[in-house]
């Protein structure tokens, strides 16, 4: 098939962009031709494309979102393709994947002044047009949670929404081959001998719950925390106030694989996530997780069986209690949870993911 993919930036940035790069690569390997409609594109994505259509960006990110949505809607009817797949704030395509979840639902959790920001209002308006404007045949989401949210917010009929879980490359994301290799990796990464290592990964620390994790960490003095992704500069006053300067280390945009393999727990007290890639990746690496119930990925969690669930992500005391429980497990118990987590996500293969898209395309006809 000749497929058009709509998204305003095909670049290396966050979870959605990473997914799109892998998705495009697997589509190409399956023999499909790709037309990419975008405002920004990196060389790797350009190399995968049979055709690239550029919509010049505006001067601001908000302007780019609005311009891309409007211009792509004009371009779509003239694309000589078999199907158009959208991934952002676009409203005209055959199938649309809401990788970030339901913005209306997330927006309700923001402070009032953030809800009133022009960009937030624009995103809400574009999302409403997507789900109520009639320009899209079928919707794809990555968790059952998001399907329910769309039904509640926009009355999207369930038969128009397919849940296709994100694929996880279990050959790439896998545990260290032996305990000895894992110990050597811990030494290489600077994890002190005998110190429980907690991993937190985020490009939006406020939304992902770092503000809850830091005070909870202060109640569990035996552990140290490594934070990957966004800078910790804005969080240093709180870190210092809590006396955590020597126990919290920022990694920047580090390669997560060695940290998944070396850490003892992945801690993810997010306030909202559709289905975080980091949760699935850490599970594939046999790293047990303490995962927020506000993440759609918890449909893969079995309490005490392959991880543990934080029911109230903003509750410092609950998180501290969960951390103490997690750190109280023996090494053998922790490893058992991790191996069970890996077994849980092994069925999430790319062939299964592409088959889900094919089924969704069939439903849209």
Regions found by a protein language model. Name each.
Residues 271:
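Aromatic "clamp/platform" in nucleotide-sugar-dependent glycosyltransferases that forms part
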Residues 236-253:
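Nucleotide-activated donor-binding/catalytic signature segment of Leloir-type glycosyltransferases, i.e.
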Residues 253-254, 258-263:
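Short alpha-helical donor nucleotide-sugar binding micro-motif in glycosyltransferases
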Residues 303-304, 308-316, 325-331:
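Conserved acidic donor-binding segment of nucleotide-sugar-dependent glycosyltransferases
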Residues 17-22, 196-219:
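A conserved mid-protein helix/loop that constitutes part of the nucleotide-sugar donor-binding site
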Residues 288-292:
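Short hydrophobic beta-strand element within catalytic cores of glycosyltransferases
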Residues 119-142, 148, 153-154:
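Membrane-proximal helix-turn-helix segments that form the acceptor-binding/catalytic region
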């Amino acid at each position: 098939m000749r497929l058009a993919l709509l998204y305003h930036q095909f670049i290396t940035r966050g979870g959605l962009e990473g997914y799109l790069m892998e998705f495009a690569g697997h589509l190409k390997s399956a023999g499909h031709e790709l037309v990419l409609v975008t405002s920004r594109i990196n060389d790797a994505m350009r190399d995968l494309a049979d055709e690239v259509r550029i919509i010049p960006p505006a001067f601001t990110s908000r302007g780019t979102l609005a311009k891309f949505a409007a211009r792509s809607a004009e371009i779509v009817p003239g694309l000589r393709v078999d199907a158009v797949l959208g991934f952002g704030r676009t409203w005209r395509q055959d199938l649309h994947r809401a990788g970030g979840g339901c913005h209306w639902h997330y927006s309700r959790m923001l402070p009032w002044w953030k809800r009133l920001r022009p960009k937030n209002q624009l995103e809400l308006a574009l999302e409403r047009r997507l789900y109520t404007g009639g320009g899209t045949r079928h919707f794809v989401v990555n968790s059952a949670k998001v399907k329910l949210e769309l039904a509640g917010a926009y009355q999207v009929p369930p038969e128009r929404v397919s849940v296709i879980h994100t694929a996880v490359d279990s050959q790439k994301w896998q545990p260290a081959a032996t305990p000895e290799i894992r110990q050597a990796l811990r030494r290489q990464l600077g994890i002190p001998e005998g110190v429980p290592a907690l991993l937190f990964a985020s490009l939006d620390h406020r939304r992902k719950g770092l503000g809850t994790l830091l005070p909870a960490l202060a109640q569990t003095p035996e552990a140290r925390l490594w934070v990957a992704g966004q800078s910790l500069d804005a969080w240093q006053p709180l870190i210092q106030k809590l006396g955590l300067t020597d126990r919290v280390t920022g990694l920047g945009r580090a390669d997560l694989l060695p940290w998944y393999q070396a850490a003892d727990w992945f801690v993810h007290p997010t306030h909202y996530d559709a289905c975080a890639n980091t949760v699935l990746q850490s599970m594939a690496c046999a790293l047990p997780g303490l995962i927020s119930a506000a993440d759609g990925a918890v449909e893969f969690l079995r309490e005490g069986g392959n991880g543990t669930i934080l029911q109230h992500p903003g509750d410092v005391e609950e998180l501290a209690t969960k951390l103490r429980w997690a750190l109280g497990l023996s090494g053998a118990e922790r490893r058992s949870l991790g191996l069970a987590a890996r077994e849980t996500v092994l069925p999430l293969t790319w062939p299964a993911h592409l088959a889900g898209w094919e089924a969704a395309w069939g439903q849209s006809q």
